[in-house]
Amino acid sequence: MTIYLFGVSNVGKTTTGELLAEKLGYVFYDLDDEVKRYYDMTLEEFVNTGRLEERDKKRSAVLRKIAEDTREKVVAVAPITYINYMNGLVRQKDVLAIELRDTPENIFDRLVFSDENDVIYRDDEYKYAHMSYYMNDIKEDIQHYGRVWSELVKNKFDMQGEAPSAVVDRLIDEFELDRDFSEEGAAWNGRK
């Protein structure tokens, strides 16, 4: 099975995905890390090259490479607007696509930054000084990607501001991820 975790930036896809993969004994991929490795550049360089559609096409090419790995896996998917490049990946048999959601306030609390070398750091003083800007940006992302993913990703999961371990436990329960679907030939195809 392949589990794709969608969501806006800073919702917690990577942390949740790593923990979920560990708990299930799956391989974990973070699309941002794979893009950096595949194109041999920092994320800062990547997001400043070409147009958004070109970058989404490149991200989708990396997702197709990840999909070639036949092991069970969890994939944290960076926000992609041009989903037509990845439609076929999500609609395959044995694929579960989940959009992780949370309130703008909870996402703001998780907000981190990265420098030009992709080193992640917290800067709460800066974050709170520009709270209005970031809250508006988060709200716009939630609205935009909610529309973009509405047809592609049928499973919506409210994180409720919980700790990542609690989110993982609820994901496992809600989607029965501890159940063996191999004999049933589960066809999640983006829905429970």
Language model feature labels by segment:
Residues 14:
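Walker A/P-loop
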Residues 11:
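ATP-binding Walker
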Residues 94-145:
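A glycine- and Lys/Arg-enriched "phosphate-lid" helix/loop adjacent to the NTP-binding pocket
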Residues 54-96, 100:
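Glycine-rich phosphate-binding loop used to anchor ATP phosphates in small-molecule kinases
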Residues 19, 23, 96, 143-192:
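NTP-dependent small-molecule kinase module
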Residues 22-64:
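Conserved substrate/cofactor phosphate-moiety recognition/catalytic segment
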Residues 8:
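P-loop (Walker A) phosphate-binding loop of NTP-binding proteins
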Residues 5:
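Hydrophobic anchor at the beta1->P-loop junction of P-loop NTPases
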